[in-house]
Amino acid sequence: MCSVGASREVILCAGAIHTPRLLLLSGVGPQADLEPLGIDTVIDLPGVGRNLQDHPWIMGLCFESKHPLPAPNYNLAGGAGFWKSRPSLDRPDLMVMPGQVPLVSDEIAARFSIPPNAFVILPCLVRPSSRGYLRLRTADPNGPLEIQPNFLAEQADVEALATCVELGLDLASQPAYRDLVKRWVVPPRRMSREATVAFVRQSCTSYLHPVGTCAMRSDGEAVVDAELRVRGIEGLRIADASVMPTIPSANTNAPSIMIGEFASRLLEAG
């Protein structure tokens, strides 16, 4: 074991999964969860590990191509489209992203025969209402975590993602796709709304954008303040996606970089 001290501050940047994990193992988190594991509570912060958010998506709607598809040079997809699931929304909550490889989840691959010369349209919910959590299952630092994203816990998320699937199929039905699509693979044909909802529940997976588990808030579940300082602990800040109170309506890489830049300015200012 190696002990390292800090003369000024410790900046925790382990991400939305491992930042709360380190805090919990160190006794910073919900006392009710720590005590049964034999972990002494340093400070009772109920919000550590709560408020887990991610982008649920369908990976993906798959179509066999009439023509050979080149391998992507540097990225799966070069663009995305944003829509509203309901006209009354103030901003889009849906994203569809075409990709030039047959990128499908294990769940979909197990149910359909995926041809190699195929492409996908990926429906994604970028403003989910469902919230999850993570917590320790043991005090052993090498032990497993319990991670529960609670995808589709809110019926509104189910309906919105079903609308996004329908939107992706509408896109594949446009004239611009006629010279490209040889046949529909996933799904093989149009579905009723009921069947679309069932397809969403069977096929939903993670976009790998976890955020929010050490959120910057102003209520009882706040973990950090407006300057990224962990509540009740001197000399400890967090600078990663875990501090986001709400998931952005896009990929989380750029916002995470912005948080890092903000942290560097705070440190420079003393």
Walk through the language-model features, giving the residues of each.
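Glycine-rich loop(s) and the adjacent beta-strand/alpha-helix scaffold that form part
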Residues: M1-P72, A139
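FAD-dependent oxidoreductase catalytic-site/capping-region signature
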Residues: S65-L69, L76-P255, A263-G270
